[in-house]
Amino acid sequence: MPNRLLLTIFILLTSMLPVFSVEQQKIILWDSDATNGGAPNALGTEDKDKPHVTVWFPDKDVAIETAVVVCPGGGYGALALDHEGRQIAEWFNAFGVTTIVLEYRHRNKGYGHPNPLLDVQRAIRTVRFHADTWGIAPAKIGVLGFSAGGHLASTAGTHFDDPPHFPEGYAADAIDALSCRPDFMVLCYPVIQFDAAATHRGSQNNLIGQDAPKELVEYYSSEKQVTDRTPPTFIFFTDEDTAVPPENGVAFYLALRRHNIPAEMHIFQKGAHGLGLAQGHPGTEHWPELCRVWLLNNGFIREPGVLDDRIMGPQQLR
């Protein structure tokens, strides 16, 4: 009898605890059953040949009309899916943003240029394709990336008007007809320069090879590709980052200024490369809130429960 009583008490207590459940949905970006026969330039039909996204939906009580495609880093040879993927999705979900974590093709899967760019462009188009169903405003779809993923995000924001790099015989579908321009960019310690001493050589080699032609190096030097249509951008770096020095971000920020693109950049004194949300790193740990306030002040997000697009005042930094 005592055991039964304890079990009853345990069930009652646990039933009173708050339940946090995040709905997720995996979407293969090019369905092999579709007319295009799978991802362009696919080397096979294994999972590694099928770029996909995991959609993290916020709780309906806080959901707003904004979505962001997240590109984890990894030097174009791996993907940091936890601290630059899952944790970022959970953070965005907390204030209502639908988050789409992209698992793009990279060198250790056998892929380089142009496939990562094709994958992020397809991811942005896929979000627009599902915007109605997911409750997303088609003009509030951004892209965020870390390190090499930040480079990929920057190419999404600078090459959306280019002719797509589809192979001969590729059959475009309804998703391909949509715009792949992100409405905003968040670039976290991104690789930007491919033709300077400050580049991350491993990312460059994995994407375009060691002996890439000058034209391709320049194509992927994102600071040289900024135009008047490049989206508003938030950038952060740390001064102690020796893997991807902040000169990368400075070059991109100055290019944005030359084209009158709204931009904000933070260089924190402390912190190594690859911090993700930077929890537990004094000073640098404020970047997520600074980013949230920037998104709020530029009208890309709103406070949950506010039914119009008024820009609310920033909350006190913690």
Mark where each language-model region is.
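Short beta-strand element of the alpha/beta-hydrolase
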Residues: 64-73
